[in-house]
Amino acid sequence: VRRRTRLLAWVAIVAQVVFVGGWVLAGALEPHYSAVRQYISELGRHGAAHPWIFVVFIGVWGLGFIALALATVPPLRTRPWPLAMPLMFVLAGVCAILVGPLHMDCSPTVSAVCKSREAAGTLSWHHYAHEWVSLGIKVSLLLTGFAFARSAWPSRLARLVLSGALVLLVAGIVTFVLHDSFVGYQGLEERLWALLAQLWALVCATVLILEATLQPGVLRAHEAASVESHALGEPAAAGVDPA
């Protein structure tokens, strides 16, 4: 189990690297593409130079989240709501895999005609499905933070993660409401959110690797210290099931 956890965590880490490398490569090969102005998804739109690259790297990214979900199952199995966080990672992964074949019709960030048709609802169903499924990735990844906080409650780590998730929720709502204010920088905005998602995945994967590498005796001592700390009324960081 520990070896499998390490392997799955490494798969999740590699997926983050593939994701960044994919949009950098596709962006470099796409004529007149601006990473600051245009969405990552526009690399896979109809008429793009190499839409298959987008399908591949976004699909690998999704598989990375599913691998991370499987890796979190054993450590959380003795915690409250043990499947909440893994299921949210699975949902994010499935959405990422589905979003690849759902190509956008055009580039709403650079084409006024495309933007107008998008607002009028005259584009194809897969264009709008792409947008909603993309939103599903963001929402499900945000919910992983709340799910972890519930599973690890009342540890200090749970409170820290919950605070961060609440801040990101507020920031997400604000940027959604003020979306049109980011005209000219929508690609940069999306990449900043993607970076936060990747950092969260990397933190989770790194913790899983470290915990799976520790000897069982060390883990038992850590859990014993956590229990003693709770008995004294001091919330401790969440431990991990040594299995």
Task: Name each model feature, range by range.
Residues 107, 212, 228-232:
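Hydrophobic alpha-helical elements and their junctions with loops/disorder across both membrane
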Residues 2-211:
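Hydrophobic, aromatic-enriched alpha-helical segments typical of multi-pass transmembrane helices
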Residues 208-221:
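Membrane-interface capping segments at transmembrane-helix boundaries
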Residues 218-243:
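Short, intrinsically disordered terminal tails adjacent to the first/last structured region
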